From Swiss-Prot:
Family that this chain belongs to: Belongs to the ferrochelatase family.
GO MF annotation terms: ferrochelatase activity; metal ion binding
Main location: cytoplasm
EC number, as in UniProt: 4.98.1.1
Protein's UniProt name: Ferrochelatase
Subcellular location as annotated: Cytoplasm
Binding site for Fe cation: H214, E295
Protein keywords: Cytoplasm, Heme biosynthesis, Iron, Lyase, Metal-binding, Porphyrin biosynthesis
An individual GO BP term: heme biosynthetic process
PANTHER family per UniProt: FERROCHELATASE, FERROCHELATASE, MITOCHONDRIAL
Reactions mediated catalytically: heme b + 2 H(+) = protoporphyrin IX + Fe(2+)
Length: 344
């Protein structure tokens, strides 16, 4: 709904309003692979209480005394392996920007909708893009955390950051948060089609298809986080859609950090065990990642593949994320159009 300009007094200042914003938000990325950029990014990420729930007195001495002195260099080297050299940025940034631009094109039938993108950690920040959308006249914003499965450490922290920005705004836009879509039919179909397309390009058939999701500490799950259950359901629906059995499909969890027990089975240990048990050919897909990033391109496509081959495996395939593909954009567009109902 657009305000009737004719009703404004003659001396009324120019004010843009009546538009609806769509803000796509992913996890984040460092600005570069150098030590300073990596440390700045890791500090913002690892001081988030949604990510690390330890008490500050316990966690900060470890973080500032050890982690932020050692890990920036190590993680920076990993990023260098998968850095988008052409654009001098991470592929996560490239894909998220592309998704935003493609979404704007797909929604061009809606005159009053503006699409933008942000990162929870790093740049562009959520706060800066909410401010920009408001300045463009968006008095309503659909906040879309790009996570098919809900977790407090991902979706909730995006919502936290957005609402924290509203605390500083005199004229707040209405904010609508997008729920998870872990069992959405279009999403499951897109994953299945991606698997079928990629495997059809190989001259071999995998003995096992692994759906590897980012892990979270087991304690988070026990406190009520629905993430594990949603990952399992996504995996089951994908397996059924592909017509596979539990003997040739499994769900695993990757990227654990620190000494705590995380969701299991662990992807790295599973890949190693499968190879040692005589499984020769496997394929891995990452259904929980909307875009390829460090955890998929380096941790799975490089590290997991190397481990599999080192322990006796012969053939390893990593199935790309949906990224900015046509099928991937259909999923995102469906979710956005659903959440725009009543506003456009």
């Amino acid at each position: 709904m657009t305000a009737d300009i004719s009703l404004r007094p003659a001396d009324h200042p120019a004010v843009k309003s009546g538009k609806v914003g769509v803000l796509l938000v992913n996890l984040g990325t460092p600005d570069g692979t150098d030590y300073t950029s990596m440390r700045r990014y890791l500090r913002e990420f690892l001081t988030d209480r949604r990510v690390i729930e330890w008490s500050r007195w316990k966690w900060y001495p470890i973080l500032f005394g050890i982690v932020l002195n050692r890990r920036p260099q190590k993680v920076g080297r990993a990023y260098e392996l998968i850095w988008n050299k052409e654009k001098n940025e991470s592929f996560l940034r490239t894909y998220t920007r592309n998704q935003s631009e493609l979404m704007a094109e797909r929604l061009k039938d809606l005159d009053n909708v503006k699409v933008d993108w942000a990162m929870r950690y790093g740049t562009p920040s959520i706060a800066s893009r909410i401010e920009a959308l408001k300045q463009e006249g968006c008095d309503r914003i659909v906040l879309f955390p790009l996570y098919p499965q809900y977790a407090a450490a991902t979706t909730a922290t995006v919502n936290d950051k957005a609402f924290h920005k509203l605390l500083s705004m005199r004229w707040q836009p209405a904010l609508r948060t997008v729920p998870d879509y872990h069992d959405d039919e279009t999403y499951i179909d897109a994953l299945a089609q991606s698997v079928e397309k990629h495997l059809s390009s190989l001259d071999w058939k995998p003995d096992m298809l692994i759906a590897s999701f980012h892990g979270i500490p087991m304690s988070y799950f026990k406190q009520g986080d629905p993430y594990y259950c949603q990952c399992q359901k996504t995996g089951r629906l994908l397996r059924e859609r592909l017509g596979l059995t539990q003997e040739n499909f499994m769900v695993t969890f990757q990227s654990r950090f620190g000494p705590e027990e995380w969701l299991q089975p662990y992807t790295d240990k599973t890949v190693e065990k499968l190879a040692r048990d005589g499984v020769k050919r496997i394929a891995v897909i990452n259904p929980g990642f909307v875009s390829d990033c460090l955890e998929t391109l380096e941790e799975i496509a490089e590290q997991a593949a190397h481990s599999f081959h080192e322990n006796g495996g012969e053939k390893f395939a990593h199935i790309p994320c949906l990224n900015d593909s046509e099928d991937g954009m259909k999923v995102l567009e469906k979710v956005v159009r659903r959440e725009l109902q009543g506003w456009v």
